[in-house]
Amino acid sequence: MASRYDRAITVFSPDGHLFQVEYAQEAVKKGSTAVGIRGTNIVVLGVEKKSVAKLQDERTVRKICALDDHVCMAFAGLTADARVVINRARVECQSHKLTVEDPVTVEYITRFIATLKQKYTQSNGRRPFGISALIVGFDDDGIPRLYQTDPSGTYHAWKANAIGRSAKTVREFLEKNYTEDAIASDNEAIKLAIKALLEVVQSGGKNIELAIIRRNQPLKMFSAKEVELYVTEIEKEKEEAEKKKSKKSV
C-alpha cells in the first residue's frame, strides 16, 4: 500500500507526505555543503569542493555561477538538475530585461526558480528537482540579498544559511558566530564564510570554492591561492587567541 504513494509524485500519502519531494530533499543532503553570508556591502558564497580526478579540468566543476550581472547562485544536490534550473533562470533574466527594460530583482528570480521547482512536484511524467539553491545579489536600492530555495518550491530570505551534506553543523556555527561585528567589513564576512566551511572541510582551502558579489560589480571567483591565504590568516588568528587564553589561565 505504501509503495503506491512512494512512486506517485502527485499523490499524498495518508499521513500527508509527498515522498518523492522528501527523497529529493535527501538528495540535497548528499550534495556538497554550500554557505551564503550577507554582509554590509557584500554577499559571500562558499562551497565545499569534492576532489577532482587528476586529468579533469577543475573549471568544469563549478557549484557557483552567475545568473545575471547582479545575481548569482550556489547549489547543493544533483548537478545535472542544477544545470537545467540555471539555464531556465538565465533565460528568464534576459527575457525580463528585454521586456521591461529593467534587470530582475533578486526576489523575482528566486520566486521564478521556486515556482519552477513547485511545478515539478505537481505534474505527471516529471520528478522534483534534486537541488537546493542559495541565490544572492543586489537590487537597485544597494541592499544585499540572500535567498534559499528547496526542492518543494519554498523560498525564504536569510542573513546567513547553509545547504547540503553538513548544513546543520554549519548553520549551528553561523547561529553562534554571525553578528554585526562579524560582517562589519567585507574581509570579515569572507573569513566568516571560510570559517563556517572549515567546520566540515578537513583539507583546508584547496577544497573550498569561494565567490563574492558587490553592488554594480560582477561575480568574483577566488583562486585556490587566494582562499589559502585567508585560511592561513584564520589559523594564525586561532593560534593567537589560544595563546591569550593560555596566558590568562596561567
Swiss-Prot record:
Annotated function: Component of the 20S core proteasome complex involved in the proteolytic degradation of most intracellular proteins. This complex plays numerous essential roles within the cell by associating with different regulatory particles. Associated with two 19S regulatory particles, forms the 26S proteasome and thus participates in the ATP-dependent degradation of ubiquitinated proteins.
Provenance organism: Macaca fascicularis
The entry's keywords: Cytoplasm, Glycoprotein, Nucleus, Proteasome
Family: Belongs to the peptidase T1A family.
Residues with glycosylation annotation: 132
Database matches in SMART domains: Proteasome_A_N
CDD domains: proteasome_alpha_type_7 (cd03755)
UniProt xrefs under PANTHER family: PROTEASOME SUBUNIT ALPHA/BETA
Compartments, as annotated in UniProt: Cytoplasm; Nucleus
Cystine pairings recorded for this chain: none
Protein name as annotated: Proteasome subunit alpha type-7-like
KW Transferase (keyword) present: no
